[in-house]
Amino acid sequence: MLDKLGQNLSDALNKIKNATFVDKKLVKEVIKDIQKALIQSDVNVKLVFNMSKEIERKAIEEAPPKGLSKKEHIVKIVYDELVKLLGETTQKLELDPSKKSVILLIGIQGSGKTTSAAKLARYIQKKGLRPGLIAADVYRPAAYQQLKQLSEKINVPLFGDETRTKTPVDITKEGMEKLKKVDVIIIDTAGRHKEEESLLAEMKEMKDLTNPNEIILVIDGTLGQQAKNQAKAFKESVSEIGSILVTKLDGSAKGGGALSAVAEINAPIKFIGTGEGVDNLEQFDPKKFISRILGLGDLDSLLEKTEDIMDESTEESIDSILKGKFTLIELYAQLETISKMGPMKQILSMIPGMGGNLPKEAAQLTEDKLKRYKIMMDSMTLEEKENPELIKTSRLQRIAKGAGVKQDEIKDLLKYYSTTKNAFGNLKRGKMPKMGGQMGQIMRQLMYKD
């Protein structure tokens, strides 16, 4: 997410981290690099200038607090100021499990509202609540079908009018009646602009009808600074906007501009879309977000993701590993778990030291290797999976042919298995593998070509 911005900011801070001596000249040079990175991400020039002055003042005038070196203190100053730029505090979606809640999604056409409705339903579902969806957009021909496909994928009830003959208000009224058994109703409304008075009037009518607990404005992250005007316009026309959901941050060069622009008008950003899948919606936490951008990691989110995909088979696999059993069967289960966690680039950005320094091809190569490793193991017999040491020349040839790969790739898999087994062995003995040691070796083997 925001790869170029993260890389540029990390490069700037590395000048501080790698310097023998930090003086005023170096501080100014680093600040110039930070300015350039933020402006390229479409952050408002005035905001960047004000933030830069504050970083320079603190870096030059303030003495590092006890326990921090001068370098660490400057990195923390930059981190704190970037967090401030994005709104500082985390705004959570508050839902009362004892009462039915209603969420109204609004935004212009093309902002990713319909996909966000399904993502939000999935997010709520993972919190243990029962969501339901209402497809109230009758103006865009594919809106109902799109939401229907997504709702079926996540097993969430949907109410809508496939014929598009009913009004959004009538659909919403009927939907509220039909979805009595759910805990949270999410309404996907039609895309609109501030000039469309009839649509705005319709939206206000739906607001009065549903009395929503929260109105969420969905904004396209590729808009950059323009997001400010859009958020402002909707805030003026619908005064009760509860929060903002910013989409398409995974591939946007202007994502930083969009986030800072929305934060500037004090509209709380509660969610960000980080990919196309229904699970790619995150609660927005400025501190965690900046940590990942700067390559400092986000272990809390990584643990949350791990908990989300834990099932009985995963737990059995972990139990086997902790008892000292680690065969290719356990390795396969671990690769399955990693695959379920989401895009590899996103996962790696949560590991301290990996985010901003991640080579461009590394994440894709990692995903490709994981897939190939699984294909290779699918070509093995149960005996071979349980006893990898049996895989010698003749078996290597057969497995390689069955998987459609070279024998060297099977050897690469067995090497990865051996490294991982040793790392888990150390974990069992109470030793934590470090990124520079065996854990680093595991990641490097996945990320780089031999």
From Swiss-Prot:
<dbReference type="GO" id="GO:0003924">
    <property type="term" value="F:GTPase activity"/>
</dbReference>
<keyword id="KW-0694">RNA-binding</keyword>
<feature type="binding site">
    <location>
        <begin position="107"/>
        <end position="114"/>
    </location>
    <ligand>
        <name>GTP</name>
    </ligand>
</feature>
<comment type="function">
    <text>Involved in targeting and insertion of nascent membrane proteins into the cytoplasmic membrane. Binds to the hydrophobic signal sequence of the ribosome-nascent chain (RNC) as it emerges from the ribosomes. The SRP-RNC complex is then targeted to the cytoplasmic membrane where it interacts with the SRP receptor FtsY.</text>
</comment>
<keyword id="KW-0547">Nucleotide-binding</keyword>
<dbReference type="Pfam" id="PF00448">
    <property type="entry name" value="SRP54"/>
</dbReference>
<dbReference type="InterPro" id="IPR000897">
    <property type="entry name" value="SRP54_GTPase_dom"/>
</dbReference>
<dbReference type="InterPro" id="IPR004125">
    <property type="entry name" value="Signal_recog_particle_SRP54_M"/>
</dbReference>
<keyword id="KW-0378">Hydrolase</keyword>
<comment type="similarity">
    <text>Belongs to the GTP-binding SRP family. SRP54 subfamily.</text>
</comment>
<dbReference type="GO" id="GO:0005525">
    <property type="term" value="F:GTP binding"/>
</dbReference>
<keyword id="KW-0687">Ribonucleoprotein</keyword>
<keyword id="KW-0733">Signal recognition particle</keyword>
<dbReference type="GO" id="GO:0048500">
    <property type="term" value="C:signal recognition particle"/>
</dbReference>
<dbReference type="InterPro" id="IPR013822">
    <property type="entry name" value="Signal_recog_particl_SRP54_hlx"/>
</dbReference>
<dbReference type="InterPro" id="IPR022941">
    <property type="entry name" value="SRP54"/>
</dbReference>
<dbReference type="GO" id="GO:0006614">
    <property type="term" value="P:SRP-dependent cotranslational protein targeting to membrane"/>
</dbReference>
<protein>
    <recommendedName>
        <fullName>Signal recognition particle 54 kDa protein</fullName>
        <ecNumber>3.6.5.4</ecNumber>
    </recommendedName>
</protein>
<dbReference type="InterPro" id="IPR003593">
    <property type="entry name" value="AAA+_ATPase"/>
</dbReference>
<dbReference type="GO" id="GO:0008312">
    <property type="term" value="F:7S RNA binding"/>
</dbReference>
<dbReference type="Pfam" id="PF02978">
    <property type="entry name" value="SRP_SPB"/>
</dbReference>
<dbReference type="GO" id="GO:0016887">
    <property type="term" value="F:ATP hydrolysis activity"/>
</dbReference>
<keyword id="KW-0963">Cytoplasm</keyword>
<dbReference type="InterPro" id="IPR042101">
    <property type="entry name" value="SRP54_N_sf"/>
</dbReference>
<dbReference type="Pfam" id="PF02881">
    <property type="entry name" value="SRP54_N"/>
</dbReference>
<dbReference type="InterPro" id="IPR036891">
    <property type="entry name" value="Signal_recog_part_SRP54_M_sf"/>
</dbReference>
<feature type="binding site">
    <location>
        <begin position="188"/>
        <end position="192"/>
    </location>
    <ligand>
        <name>GTP</name>
    </ligand>
</feature>
<feature type="binding site">
    <location>
        <begin position="247"/>
        <end position="250"/>
    </location>
    <ligand>
        <name>GTP</name>
    </ligand>
</feature>
<keyword id="KW-0342">GTP-binding</keyword>
<dbReference type="InterPro" id="IPR027417">
    <property type="entry name" value="P-loop_NTPase"/>
</dbReference>
<dbReference type="InterPro" id="IPR036225">
    <property type="entry name" value="SRP/SRP_N"/>
</dbReference>
<comment type="subunit">
    <text>Part of the signal recognition particle protein translocation system, which is composed of SRP and FtsY. Archaeal SRP consists of a 7S RNA molecule of 300 nucleotides and two protein subunits: SRP54 and SRP19.</text>
</comment>
